[in-house]
């Protein structure tokens, strides 16, 4: 699969890079994989679109700060879209914290379960492995109520507006 980052950073060296136009999903050995590169993960819609396109696992290559809010957001993307999420990040100050989250957030008895599969610290350099039970994830997606189950698409139309309103207008925005 060839994929270009959709949400480039207008405030950094990426300002002059042409952004991708769509999110893509591919089949890899029977698993539907989607990709969100770095800043793409800042937008919940990125994961939602990948879920709508059939992604079961979303890979997130990342090379920027991994503050706890960003780490928690990936757990939330896994939960709300019923997809597994795995992020790889270099180690070091304001980085590190490669992580993986399962979409499974409660068991068959309705008891909440921790969906953390892997959470590395920000100092250790290495290769980390996260294993997802795809059979369990697929069974979970077939029985639970999140993802696209009860979504009211007509209420989401404002997400398609290109208008940027105060206080979010910035000098030099590439639009």
Which residue stretches match the model-derived regions?
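Active-site catalytic loop in hydrolytic enzyme cores
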Residues: 1-53, 62, 68-76, 100, ...
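C-terminal beta-strand edge segments of enzyme domains
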Residues: 25, 90-175
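Short amphipathic alpha-helical surface micro-motifs
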Residues: 7-8, 16-20, 80-83, 108-114, ...
């Amino acid at each position: 699969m060839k994929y270009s980052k959709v949400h480039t950073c207008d405030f950094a060296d990426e300002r002059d890079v042409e952004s991708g136009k769509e999110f893509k999903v591919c089949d890899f050995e029977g698993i539907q994989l989607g990709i969100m590169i770095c800043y793409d993960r800042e937008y919940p819609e990125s994961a939602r679109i990948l879920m709508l396109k059939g992604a079961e696992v979303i890979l997130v290559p990342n090379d920027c700060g991994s503050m706890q809010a960003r780490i928690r957001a990936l757990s939330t993307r896994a939960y709300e879209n019923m997809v597994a999420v795995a992020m790889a990040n270099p180690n070091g100050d304001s980085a590190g914290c490669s992580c993986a989250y399962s979409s499974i957030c409660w068991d068959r008895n309705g008891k909440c379960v921790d969906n953390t599969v892997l959470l590395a610290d920000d100092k250790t350099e290495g290769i980390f492995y996260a294993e997802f039970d795809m059979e369990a994830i697929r069974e979970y997606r077939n029985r639970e109520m999140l993802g696209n189950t009860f979504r009211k698409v007509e209420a989401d139309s404002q997400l398609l507006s290109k208008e940027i309103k105060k206080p979010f207008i910035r000098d030099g925005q590439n639009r």
